[in-house]
Amino acid sequence: MRGTDKQQSGMFSELSPEERVPEKHPLRAIRGMTDEVLKGLWAKFNELYSITGRPSIAPEKLLRALLLQILYTVRSERLLMEQLQYNLLFRWFVGLNMDEPVWVATVFSKNRDRLLEGEIARLFFAGVLEQARSADLLSDEHFSVDGTLMEAWAGQKSFQRKDGSEKPPPDEAGNPTVDFHGEKRSNETHESTTDADARLARKSGGHEAKLAYCGNVLIENRNGLVVDAELLQANGTAERDAALLMAERMEGSQRVTVAADKGYDTQELVREMRGMNVTPHVAQNDHRRGGSAMDGRTTRQPGYKVSQVKRKRIEEVFGWLKTVGMLPKTRPGGVHTVGWVFTFAAAAYHLVRMRNLLYMPVQSV
């Protein structure tokens, strides 16, 4: 018997959002790990908020929503609020009831800015990392480091002289034509009027220079999990500076290895890392003036060759951050804000990897 095409929707439902989400849905495991981290941030949240006044958006719900925005590549807060209106899965993950109103996008953004003022992203990342350590997913001996350029949300037309020298009036007020030919532009004489912290940089000689930041991650070599993240202004030494910063923050007193590409093959970096009880497994740059800083004491070891293979897994992290994690371009706001988003996106990647390692069924051959 053919069913009727009824258009009248029911007024009531006896099923909760919890019951509608499949037991094996990937977000179930991710939400469980996220909630565990948020419990540990309760005291820190109390420090950020006043005990009087109107209640804000709960920081726990705010962070869950921001996590969804990264995991599902929702390009703006306005679209995220739209999704929360009708997407049952999103409502369940954030913790909204079926009839609970969704926040106005501008209110959501204002509340998000409060979290940007604190080190919440760094603390959230540390909480996720501690779960991975408790599950014995992290190597405490072998690591890899690398950096990549994160294109800033600023156009070339915004890169103007710092001295404000006179320029001819624009031919079109909204989108003026700008001719850069014959003009020498550098970070010493110019800066972006859109994002003053962005720097003109290029990854290598064959690429065009863009306004960008330098995003750096340190991964452990067992499962390719991110153990530290650092975003700096893009300059000639940003990758090496970040590598030393992250090496200095590493826990434990035992000697460890850190693999890196040829760009890190300098006498200064190798010397400073060895002084931190770190054995650098840096790819040799024999074309460098003075030769490679790496000698046979390190390169003849079997572990050195293994590190050179393992370090390439770091590209998986950058690939995810620049596609799923919405970081092919950063958002305006300066190095602090962009660094906050970069660290939080690295934590999101970490949650996805942990879910795959801990909860994915093993395929039998």
Where are these regions (language model features)?
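Short, well-ordered loop/turn and helix-capping segments at boundaries between secondary-structure elements
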Residues: 71, 86, 90, 219, ...
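Helix-centered, glycine/charged polyanion-binding patches within enzymatic domains
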Residues: 164-168, 178, 185, 262-336, ...
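Polybasic low-complexity intrinsically disordered regions
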Residues: 82-85, 94-276, 285, 355
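In a subset of proteins, long, contiguous C-terminal domains/tails are tracked
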Residues: 337-365
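Basic, low-complexity intrinsically disordered segments
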Residues: 2-5, 9-11, 15, 30-137, ...
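Short acidic (Asp/Glu) and glycine-rich catalytic loops that position anionic groups and cofactors
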Residues: 8-13, 41-45, 106-108, 194, ...
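Charged, often Cys/His-bearing segments associated with DNA-binding zinc-finger transcription factors
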Residues: 1-36, 176-180, 354-365
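Secondary-structure capping and boundary motifs in well-ordered enzyme cores
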Residues: 22, 26, 53-61, 72, ...
